[in-house]
């Protein structure tokens, strides 16, 4: 039987941990079990409970102090250490067979765009631990206010899709922050990115030298036709969480990974007709 895992990716501050917790909470409310695996050795203490935590193996702060490295160098060292000790991860995952594991990943995208750290871990999960994996890439909705920044984020999402070679779901998080600034009709244009959005952008006037570059990036995203977003509002719209989970279930074939359950025998109650 295959395990099911979800990777939460995206820049720092987009709400990955909040997303992970929202998915966990929703799954618990419908009677399903799931756990968060923290893969960020620099994670700050939070209200969210991690079932498996890379900081039990190695932490960024310890590496910075002992190896005299900066934050980025220490982060790479932590992941290289993890790759050399994947048996620790195997042991921690252990008997989690019929439960979701949600991997909360660091926000530094160079871990999969510049060095093959995350792709290596992904392949290990697939081949050695028999995981059906799905990647989710979060981009915060306020990016749509700065359209060139939005298309830059969409390009990063596409890069992750290509390099990780996983079923991929892109998510526009923190939708509640732009509800008073962007209409539903306009938002739909960002959920399925349209390069024509740049034509109405003030960026072309304030930064004319970047207009050509921004247009090239937008057209590249459009040419591949790979990037679409689902809206997410963890604070006020539980339906958006349920919708995203249904997409994850579909691409990971969750229902097919479940063992058939024995039918519950009906118990006939004795009735006294007298």
From Swiss-Prot:
GO biological process, one term: mitotic sister chromatid cohesion
UniProt xrefs under Pfam families: ATP_bind_1
GO molecular function list: GTP binding; GTPase activity
Chain location of the short sequence motif Gly-Pro-Asn (GPN)-loop per the record: 70-72
Listed CDD domains: GPN3
PANTHER family: GPN-LOOP GTPASE 3, XPA-BINDING PROTEIN 1-RELATED
Purpose: Small GTPase required for proper nuclear import of RNA polymerase II and III (RNAPII and RNAPIII). May act at an RNAP assembly step prior to nuclear import.
Official protein name in the record: GPN-loop GTPase 3
């Amino acid at each position: 039987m295959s395990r099911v895992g979800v990777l939460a990716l995206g820049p720092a501050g987009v709400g990955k941990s909040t997303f992970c917790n929202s998915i966990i909470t929703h799954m618990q409310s419908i009677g399903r079990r799931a756990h968060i695996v923290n893969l960020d050795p620099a994670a700050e203490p939070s209200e969210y409970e991690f079932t498996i935590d890379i900081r039990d193996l190695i932490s960024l702060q310890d590496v910075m102090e002992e190896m005299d490295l900066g934050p980025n160098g220490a982060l790479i060292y932590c992941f290289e250490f993890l790759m050399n000790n994947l048996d620790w991860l195997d042991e921690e995952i252990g008997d989690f067979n019929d439960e979701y594991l949600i991997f909360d990943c660091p926000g530094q995208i160079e871990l999969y765009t510049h060095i093959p750290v995350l792709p290596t871990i992904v392949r290990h999960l697939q081949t050695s631990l028999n995981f059906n994996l799905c990647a989710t890439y979060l981009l915060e909705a306020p990016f749509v206010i700065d359209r060139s920044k939005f298309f830059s984020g969409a390009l990063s999402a596409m890069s992750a899709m290509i390099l990780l070679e996983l079923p991929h779901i892109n998510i526009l998080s923190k939708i509640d922050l732009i509800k008073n600034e962007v209409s539903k009709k306009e938002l739909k244009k960002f959920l399925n990115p349209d390069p024509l959005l740049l034509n109405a952008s003030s960026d072309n006037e304030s930064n004319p030298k970047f207009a050509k570059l921004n247009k090239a990036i937008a057209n590249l995203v459009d040419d591949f036709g790979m990037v679409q977003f689902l809206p997410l509002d963890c604070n006020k719209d539980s339906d958006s969480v349920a919708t995203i989970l249904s997409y994850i279930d579909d691409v990971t074939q969750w229902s097919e990974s479940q063992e058939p359950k024995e039918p519950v025998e009906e118990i006939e109650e004795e009735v006294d007709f007298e």
